[in-house]
């Protein structure tokens, strides 16, 4: 399923929302009343020029930063994050640009990194021994479910290509998220073939029912995969665009401020 046949509709349920987020770093205002809306079953790309506030927005949504003002709403309930662990507890998983995979560990160990399954009884509760067999079995199941073609879950991540490593990171997020997956530049520094591999995996995550927030500077990838495009500008939500109705050049013009959103035809807005 590509973006042109995505199931997303304007009436889709709002999964995650932010209203009036403000974030200041000393004298610098990174977010100045930013709004955000993520719908069920969509891939929402977040784009913006340097200093537009997209990174601060994503940090607030993932719990990495606490906003000074405003509110974040998940499934209709206002939530407050003190840190990324709080976001993970409510089913929001984030893959940052630096991947955060452990190269020397196996794929199975990476999938359960920080969420290791322990053996039952004395062995697990007292001796803290891991149930490696169960983790391996579940890793195989989860990777097969997302159709990630990696030969063995017992091979070290350092033996994988860049695209395969990114797929491991995305699959780990999808395995434990039950609300939202946030991906920060998932195809950065990847070749064409590996970039396409990651994009296809992101589609499958979406098609499994998890909405995806995709932060990217790669406009061809954004237009290939996104259902809607959130444009961050000057610390606010500049516009939300329909990639099937607006050109890439006009999108860049909106992002840089050369084209005011109010001058766009209504069909270009989403």
What residues fall within each predicted segment?
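Glycine-rich phosphate-binding loops of nucleotide-dependent enzymes
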Residues: 2-270
């Amino acid at each position: 399923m590509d973006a042109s046949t995505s199931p997303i509709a304007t009436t889709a349920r709002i999964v995650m929302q932010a209203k009036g987020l403000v974030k200041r770093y000393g004298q610098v205002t990174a977010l100045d009343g930013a709004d955000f809306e993520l719908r069920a079953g969509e891939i929402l790309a977040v784009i913006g020029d340097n200093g537009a506030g997209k990174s601060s927005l994503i940090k607030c949504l993932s719990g990495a930063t606490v906003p000074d003002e405003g509110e974040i709403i998940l499934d209709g309930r206002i939530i407050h994050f003190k840190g990324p662990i709080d976001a993970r507890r409510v089913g929001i998983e984030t893959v940052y640009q630096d991947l955060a995979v452990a190269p020397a560990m196996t794929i199975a160990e990476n999938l359960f990194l920080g969420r290791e399954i322990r053996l039952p009884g004395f062995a697990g509760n007292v001796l803290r021994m891991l149930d490696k067999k169960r983790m391996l079995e579940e890793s195989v199941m989860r990777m097969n479910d997302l159709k990630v073609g990696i030969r063995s879950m017992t091979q070290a991540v350092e033996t994988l290509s860049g695209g395969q490593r990114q797929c491991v990171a995305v699959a780990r997020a999808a395995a434990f998220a039950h609300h939202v997956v946030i991906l920060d530049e998932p195809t950065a520094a990847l070749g064409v073939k590996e970039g396409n591999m990651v994009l296809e995996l992101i589609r499958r995550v979406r098609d499994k029912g998890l909405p995806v927030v995709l932060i990217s500077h790669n406009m061809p990838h954004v237009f290939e995969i996104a259902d809607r495009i959130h444009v961050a500008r000057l610390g606010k939500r500049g516009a939300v665009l329909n990639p099937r109705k607006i050109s890439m050049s006009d999108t860049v013009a909106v992002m840089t401020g050369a084209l005011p959103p109010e001058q766009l035809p209504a069909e270009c807005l989403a």
